[in-house]
């Protein structure tokens, strides 16, 4: 889908598109140690890791972790190096970028959508590269608050943008599947940089565009 200009907004909505972080051959994650640890967990909960249904589970989990945490060994800034030199100096917004990550507190998934808006200062990045940056940061043990800040800070510095806004909406399975068990509850975090932080009118505009449905 090509971006469309709406007023002073260059906007593209990304729906149901997955940007997969592919594990690198240089990824130093030790799959054997993970598999051994999973086997010990199965024993610790009273299961038989040698029964048919669990025999390959340790290796499956090891391969899964190799994929889920591949962002630990990838530099998200690499996706910001190629940009277009453009005179466009109003808001660019990419809304509803789906993501999932693993919370470092309980090692349980949280997932949702990320909205990124920025005002360029001569550097416009390819829209898919924003999703790539998200994929690298989200394929690590994370906290939603830190994930939000990391994305905003990287884009603000690497693009030398006039303003950056990142809003993350996520459902945490550590709250929906355990503990208080409140499915459907969302955590919303935001990080603002530059003009969106300094100027109330700019902040109100970008938040209105993000919330517009």
Predicted regions: what they are:
Residues 10-213:
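A domain-level signal for the structural core that forms small-molecule/cofactor-binding pockets
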């Amino acid at each position: 889908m090509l971006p469309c200009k709406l007023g002073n907004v260059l906007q593209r909505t990304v729906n149901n598109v997955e940007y997969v972080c592919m594990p690198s051959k240089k990824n130093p994650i030790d799959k054997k140690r993970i598999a051994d640890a999973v086997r010990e967990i199965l024993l610790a909960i009273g299961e038989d890791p040698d029964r048919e249904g669990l025999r390959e589970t340790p290796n499956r989990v090891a391969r899964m972790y190799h994929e889920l945490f591949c962002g630990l060994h990838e530099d998200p800034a690499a996706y910001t190096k190629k940009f277009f030199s453009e005179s466009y100096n109003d808001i660019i917004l990419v809304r509803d970028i789906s993501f999932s990550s693993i919370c470092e507190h309980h090692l349980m998934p949280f997932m949702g959508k990320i909205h990124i808006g920025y005002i360029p200062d001569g550097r416009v990045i390819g829209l898919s590269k924003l999703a790539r940056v998200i994929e690298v940061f989200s394929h690590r043990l994370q906290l939603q608050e830190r994930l939000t800040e990391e994305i905003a800070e990287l884009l603000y510095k690497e693009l030398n943008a006039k303003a950056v806004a990142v809003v993350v909406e996520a459902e945490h399975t550590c709250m929906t599947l355990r503990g208080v068990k409140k499915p459907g509850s969302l955590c919303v975090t935001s990080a603002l940089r530059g003009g969106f932080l300094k100027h109330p009118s700019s902040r109100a505009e970008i938040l209105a565009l993000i919330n517009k449905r």
